[in-house]
From Swiss-Prot:
Primary location group: membrane
Superkingdom assignment: Bacteria
Protein name: Cell division protein FtsB
Organism: Cupriavidus necator (strain ATCC 17699 / DSM 428 / KCTC 22496 / NCIMB 10442 / H16 / Stanier 337)
Family to which the UniProt record says this protein belongs: Belongs to the FtsB family.
UniProt subunit comment: Part of a complex composed of FtsB, FtsL and FtsQ.
UniProt keywords, alphabetically: Cell cycle, Cell division, Cell inner membrane, Cell membrane, Coiled coil, Membrane, Transmembrane, Transmembrane helix
Coiled-coil portions: 34-63
Side of membrane Cytoplasmic, spans: 1-3
UniProt topological domain (Periplasmic) ranges: 22-113
NCBIfam families, per the entry: PRK00888.1
Stated role: Essential cell division protein. May link together the upstream cell division proteins, which are predominantly cytoplasmic, with the downstream cell division proteins, which are predominantly periplasmic.
GO terms of biological process kind: FtsZ-dependent cytokinesis
Cross-referenced PANTHER family: CELL DIVISION PROTEIN FTSB
Length: 113
């Protein structure tokens, strides 16, 4: 009886091996699902980037708006008759007087009289 129980237990383990660790086992399926989720996230990011680039390409091909915008912001160009005005934030004020030196009769200056 004990031998039969041991044999059944070993057979049960042999049957469970492919379910958990085999080529199509649960661990492999879990890993593939994780990879699929990560790839889906990367694909979505790339789709958004591609859509942005397609819009920019279409704008460059069809109109002069994008070219004019780049010329203004990247090259600092202005149209004829326009005046370029730039507002600069004021710099923080610096004190005109230098800091005072420490007093000559300080405790550190005494030689231990």
């Amino acid at each position: 009886m004990r031998l039969i129980s041991l044999l059944l237990f070993v057979l049960l383990l042999a049957i469970q091996y492919p379910l958990w660790l085999g080529k199509g086992g649960w661990l492999r399926v879990w890993d593939l699902n994780r990879q699929l989720t990560e790839q889906g996230t990367r694909n979505q990011t790339l789709k958004l980037r591609n859509a942005k680039l397609e819009g920019e390409v279409a704008d460059l091909q069809d109109g002069t708006g994008a070219i004019e915008e780049r010329a203004r912001y990247e090259l600092g160009m202005v149209r004829e008759g326009e005046v370029f005005v730039q507002f600069v934030a004021p710099a923080p004020k610096v004190s005109a007087t230098p800091p005072l030196p420490p007093p000559a009769n300080s405790v550190a200056g005494r030689g231990g009289h």
